[in-house]
Amino acid sequence: MQDRQKAQDYRALLLADTPLIDVRAPIEFEQGAMPGAINLPLMMDDERAAVGTCYKRQGADAALALGHRLVCGDIRQQRLEAWKAAYQRFPNGYLCCARGGQRSHIVQRWLQETGIDCPLIEGGYKALRQTAIQATWQLAQKPILLIGGCTGSGKTQLVRQQPNGVDLEGLARHRGSSFGRTLNPQLSQASFENKLAVELLKINARQTLKRWVLEDEGRTIGANHLPECLRERMAQAPIAVVEDPFALRLERLREEYFIRMHHDFTHAYGDEAGWQAYSEYLHHGLFAIRRRLGLQRFAELTDTLDRALAEQLSSGSTDGHMAWLVPLLNEYYDPMYRYQLEKKAANIVFRGPWQDVANWLKAQ
């Protein structure tokens, strides 16, 4: 235990997926947390706010006394039992608060009184967060190769197959387009960046890394934006472009957005509620780009989408969706991506069908 008490190699802690018993208030945890952390607060949001106000008006001693009055008796015991259960479940875990200050020390002392000696993170979440930021900046300096291509080209699958591939969309829980959301809500910006940093550290530790393989992304993936240090490096990176037949792209999109998403929604919510959520998901994706489509074209495609959904509901066929997906690709997504790719034409080092790009990557 003495070694663990002193062990503050933050990178090693992140690499090991070290369980963190994060005792910050829920609002702090939601704003940013490390992968693998569980939130078991010493004080809830309202309690923390009251203590903070007291600190400003009456000083540290009065604030500490108020905190002990707010977290006492049954409340204290309930929270103590939760921390004990977490430590029993994760005996290699660490306590963590914002800066390694009073909150984690108080919880540590209360646990010690029950016979549990749980170490804490010196410097707290802030120290781990700074380590994550520094790691991303350092590892982003390695060479990068981008995988480009129009929507439905199988870029994400190609990235996932590479031992040095980083699935940015998977980390962001979003596939990048207006239809890109998944059933899992996106993380906060800080939590996304922390998760990305840990992924980079893990991949880098597994192998002698020549370069990263990433999907050619914009500045944002849904609500998350890429760290600027990584985005700057990606803007200069060589690109391998997947150019598959249009029909093959349509089949990939059918599988991903109409078959799999319908399955995921109904599996999560049941047939009726799942169908409603799936329908709203497709409508929301189209609505998000209504201004770029023009309101008349948006209305036309919405009518076509409604007919396609009715057909899918009655027969299970997804063929009707092609009547709005094809023009959406031809009129919006493909021209937009090709315009963006033209601006980076000098960076293109290879282009060809999916399998040719996969073989080219393997030969590098």
From Swiss-Prot:
Keyword Transferase included in the entry's annotation: yes
EC number: 2.9.1.3
Record bears the keyword Cell wall biogenesis/degradation: no
Keyword terms of this UniProt record: Selenium, Transferase
SMART domains for the chain: RHOD
GO terms assigned for molecular function: transferase activity, transferring alkyl or aryl (other than methyl) groups; tRNA 2-selenouridine synthase activity
Enzyme superclass (EC): transferase
GO process terms (BP): tRNA wobble uridine modification
SUPFAM superfamilies for this protein: Rhodanese/Cell cycle control phosphatase
Transmembrane spans: none
Organism domain of life: Bacteria
CDD domains reported for this sequence: RHOD_YbbB
Active site (record annotation): 97 (s-selanylcysteine intermediate)
Catalysed reactions listed for this entry: 5-methylaminomethyl-2-thiouridine(34) in tRNA + selenophosphate + (2E)-geranyl diphosphate + H2O + H(+) = 5-methylaminomethyl-2-selenouridine(34) in tRNA + (2E)-thiogeraniol + phosphate + diphosphate; 5-methylaminomethyl-2-thiouridine(34) in tRNA + (2E)-geranyl diphosphate = 5-methylaminomethyl-S-(2E)-geranyl-thiouridine(34) in tRNA + diphosphate; 5-methylaminomethyl-S-(2E)-geranyl-thiouridine(34) in tRNA + selenophosphate + H(+) = 5-methylaminomethyl-2-(Se-phospho)selenouridine(34) in tRNA + (2E)-thiogeraniol; 5-methylaminomethyl-2-(Se-phospho)selenouridine(34) in tRNA + H2O = 5-methylaminomethyl-2-selenouridine(34) in tRNA + phosphate
InterPro entries according to UniProt: Rhodanese-like_dom, Rhodanese-like_dom_sf, SelU
Ranges of residues in domain Rhodanese: 14-137
Function: Involved in the post-transcriptional modification of the uridine at the wobble position (U34) of tRNA(Lys), tRNA(Glu) and tRNA(Gln). Catalyzes the conversion of 2-thiouridine (S2U-RNA) to 2-selenouridine (Se2U-RNA). Acts in a two-step process involving geranylation of 2-thiouridine (S2U) to S-geranyl-2-thiouridine (geS2U) and subsequent selenation of the latter derivative to 2-selenouridine (Se2U) in the tRNA chain.
Subunit structure: Monomer.
Family listed: Belongs to the SelU family.
Matches recorded under NCBIfam families: PRK11784.1-1, PRK11784.1-3, tRNA_sel_U_synt
Protein name listed in UniProt: tRNA 2-selenouridine synthase
Species name: Salmonella newport (strain SL254)
